[in-house]
Amino acid sequence: MGGQVLRFQDVSVRRDGAALLRGIDWSVREDERWVIIGPNGAGKTTLLQVAGALLYPTEGSVDVLGERLGQVDVFELRTRIGLASAALAERVPPDEKVIDLVLTASYAILGRWTEEYDSHDVTRAVELIDQLGCAHLIRRRFSTLSEGERKRVQIARALMPDPELLLLDEPAAGLDVAGREDLVRRLGGLARDSKAPSMVLVTHHVEEIPAGFTHAMLLRHGSAVAQGPIESVMTADNLSRTFGVPLALDRSMDGRWYARPY
């Protein structure tokens, strides 16, 4: 079993009098792939922001890649973390080309300036873009891409700095069925890659959980309903308590989950 990548101890987050997270105890190890699932407003994105050193807890302690938040240079720490999120996509300069968007992740910046990239950086960026099925888009502007293409390019960017931790905030949100299935399949391949970093994926749809994910946390109103190995956590009872409605849960032969009301 690998070393510890994330550790939350009694973590709470409050903003404007509202409790966004309540007493979260959680740890992620190097060889684990976690999905965080729950309804809208459950605290999933807040949890990911804390894990990505983008937000400090109001109470409790957080260790990210062996560094304690509040006692570390977070700008340096963030270079060791890959992040793909809608908030990041909104900050991309409209004329940014796909190749440049991926390359600039080496410096944890957006927008090409005067920085220099060697042949190794360019080769890695091209390989990642190709791995995510976007080789034909390499010279396109990010603003001209479809939603599915943007999601895949964001993941290539998140992987560019060879991160020790990969955070994916609702990567399949806004995709049609074909786009979602293509992305989930690619993420499943990444999850099963022994060389891939530790992963934490946020979603509120169980059908978006890629095969190969090993652990799950179910969140409701900022509190953990259940967490641990995915086979023990993903039950109809746990899912029904998380979403507040009776749900049946099925799993296909390829390891994918599907929920339906009953």
Where in the sequence are the language-model features?
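Helix-to-loop junction immediately C-terminal to a conserved catalytic motif
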Residues: 52
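H-loop (His-switch) and adjacent beta-strand-loop-beta switch element
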Residues: 216-229
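Conserved ABC ATPase signature
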Residues: 116, 141-145, 149
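Conserved ABC ATPase "signature" region
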Residues: 103, 118-137
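Catalytic Walker B motif of ABC-type/P-loop ATPase nucleotide-binding domains
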Residues: 166-170
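Conserved ABC transporter NBD signature motif
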Residues: 60-70
